[in-house]
Each structure stands twice: as C-alpha cells, then as structure tokens.
C-alpha cells in the first residue's frame, strides 16, 4: 500500500489519537504502544488504544497503491513527523517495512501486523442520542474540576452525566465540593445515565470538543460509551458502581442569602489566602448585612490578613461566620461566569450553597462547599 498525505495534517491527527495511549497499558500489552493505520480508498483511519479506551480519527489522502492496514510505534512516527516542515509526504508499506519519503530524504521503520490490535466495540444503534457539541463541552468544563482523585472510590473520580427526556444534568464531587450543572435546553427524549472517567472527560473538553460547532453522537451500553464527531470517535469504558444521590446532599433551603460581587470576592480571597496556614488553607468569612469580612491567619509564623468587601442580601440581621478551604472555594468561584453570586448559608457547620446569578438561558448551576471547623468555636 502507498499513499500521499500532508505531513502537518497527519501529525496533528496522530497527536490527537495518541493522547489515549496509556504507558501502563502499553507495558502490559505491547501492541498498544502502536498506532493502527488503515487505508480504504482515499480515506486513512488512525486508531490508538489502551486497555479501556480507543480513539479513531479519519482523514483524506491520495491513494497511490492498494488498501490495507499496519501498525507503527506511536513515538517513532510522531518524532519523525515533528521535525518535518509541512509538505506532502509519501508513505509506502511492504513486507513489514514502512518507508516515509519527504522532499529531500526518507525514514524507514517497522510496520507490524495489525491483526493483534484490539477490535472496536459494537453498540446497539437504539442506545444513542445526539446533542450539540458546545453544550456537552460546557457541561464537562463546568464540572470535571470537582471530581475526586481518590481511587478508593472510583465512581467519584468521574463526571456523572444524567440524561432526562427534557434536560441534561452533569455532576462531579470530591466530597468537599460538589457541582451540579443543569442544561434545560437538551431534549434527548430518553432517560439514561453513566459516569465518565475524568481522564476521558478531559480528553473531550481539551482536544475533541473545543473547536466543534456541530453535533456529537453518543452511543452507549452497560460498560462503554462512544462519542462520535465528524472526523474522530472516542470510545471509553465507564466507571462502575452507583453514583450517590446528588440532590439529597444539597440543602433545600438556607437561613442566610448573601449576594457578593464575583471578581471582588475572587481577588480579595486570593490576597488574604497568601497569609493563611499552608497546612489548612483556611480562610474565614464574617458576613453581615452590607459587608463580607475575609480573614486568614498562620499561627506558626505569626502572619495574618483581613479584607472587607461589599455584600448585600439577608444575613438574618446577625453575624454569619464560616470557614472554607481556600483552594476548594477558589476552584468553584473561578468556574463561574457573570458578575455576582449568591451564597446560601445556615450555620458554620452546614454546607454552603453557591450559585452564579447570571447564566445562559436554560442553564442552572448549583455548587456545594463543605465548611471547615473553626478552632475554639
């Protein structure tokens, strides 16, 4: 087989599919160190996989001789193409040898048999939905940062996608914070749910969905899910287990509701947190009607900071004092758009609910943060 393709286009597609390769999987199954090339007419299909996931990309080439398939070590072909300026290249494979010819030279490397490469997973065509790629991107970006990295509870290390007939709910939590993102614009017409590993969610949000404006087709079964875009498809194994009832942990009502300017709160918290204990990163909020005082202290090195910003709303006419982990709080605040947020509190031992007051039409965002115990209180 022989074909001609743009070196830059091939390199970019190889870079994308190679992101699914996992060094642990390839050590256990050496064939997974490779990328599979399959030529059919003028279409070249590239496939990379680990033991749980698989990514496929397609691009157009100029076929010069025959169809077929072979596999090449990912690092070999990527390193070779990385050093080339963009130009047409010719790739020919004969008797286990690949020869890549460019304007003033050539590379030769092994082309192994493709038969040992893992086969694709079959899905029931009835178990599929379609939704706008930008909508899925926003749902993942708004939640994935809150997922846990504690492998002792695998189900919490992913993004839970809960499809209803009239909406999509995306949830992630690490036990200290929780994000529930609801898109009422998504009308899938069916009810299903699955938990997507954070690594796969990150691949989707950082590389596959970020420039897509069309539709993504989602196919699924009990163990796997597939995200199909015009020129690339990602198949992943789902996290096993039952996701906790996320609605049950969000307080239905709160005694105090305080409205704060979001940019002011982010910048003030950042300045005060510089003087917080490095071990706890605790910052304390004292809310009254009209103001929010933010303070932190590091007893070990005798440093402290305090700053007051405007606040409005109902503080029940008395002081509301509560402590939060700065890193947890900041991760929530930086995920919001808009200018103002509502902070709903009951007392210093119960979770705070933070919601942005400005969102896109049909979008609801609710976040939860567990308070930290205040010493001596």
Task: Describe the residue ranges of each PLM region.
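Structural preference for solvent-exposed beta-strand-turn elements
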Residues: 1-377
């Amino acid at each position: 087989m022989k074909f001609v393709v743009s070196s830059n286009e091939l390199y970019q597609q190889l870079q994308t599919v190679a992101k699914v390769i996992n060094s642990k999987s390839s050590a256990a199954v050496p064939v997974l160190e490779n990328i599979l090339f399959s030529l059919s007419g003028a279409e070249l299909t590239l496939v990379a996989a680990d033991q749980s996931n698989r990514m496929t990309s397609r691009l157009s080439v100029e076929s010069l001789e025959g169809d077929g398939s072979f596999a090449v070590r990912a690092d070999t072909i990527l390193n070779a193409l990385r050093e080339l300026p963009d130009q047409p290249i010719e790739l020919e494979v004969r008797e286990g040898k690949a020869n890549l010819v460019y304007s003033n030279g050539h590379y030769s490397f092994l082309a192994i048999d493709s038969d040992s490469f893992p086969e694709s997973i079959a899905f029931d065509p009835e178990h599929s939905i379609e939704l706008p790629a930008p909508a899925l991107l926003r749902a993942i970006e708004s939640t994935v940062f809150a997922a846990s990295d504690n492998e002792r509870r695998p189900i919490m290390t992913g993004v839970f996608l809960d499809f209803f007939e009239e909406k999509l709910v995306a949830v992630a939590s690490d036990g200290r914070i929780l994000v529930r993102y609801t898109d009422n614009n998504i009308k899938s017409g069916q009810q299903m749910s699955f938990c997507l590993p954070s690594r796969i969610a990150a691949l989707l949000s950082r590389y596959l969905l970020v420039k897509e404006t069309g539709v993504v087709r989602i196919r699924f079964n009990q163990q796997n899910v597939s995200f199909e875009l015009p020129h690339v498809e990602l198949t992943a194994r789902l996290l096993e287990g039952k996701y906790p009832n996320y609605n049950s942990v969000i307080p239905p009502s709160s005694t105090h509701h305080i409205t704060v300017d979001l940019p002011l709160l982010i910048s003030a918290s950042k300045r005060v947190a510089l003087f917080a204990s490095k071990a706890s990163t605790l910052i304390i909020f004292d809310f009254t009607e009209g103001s929010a005082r933010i303070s932190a202290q590091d007893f070990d090195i005798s440093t402290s900071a305090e700053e007051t910003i405007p606040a409005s709303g109902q503080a029940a006419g008395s002081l509301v004092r509560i402590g939060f982990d700065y890193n947890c709080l900041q991760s929530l605040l930086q995920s919001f758009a808009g200018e103002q947020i509502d902070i709903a509190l009951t007392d210093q031992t119960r979770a705070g609910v933070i919601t942005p007051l400005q969102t896109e039409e049909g979008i609801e965002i609710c976040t939860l943060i567990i308070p930290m115990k205040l010493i001596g209180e």
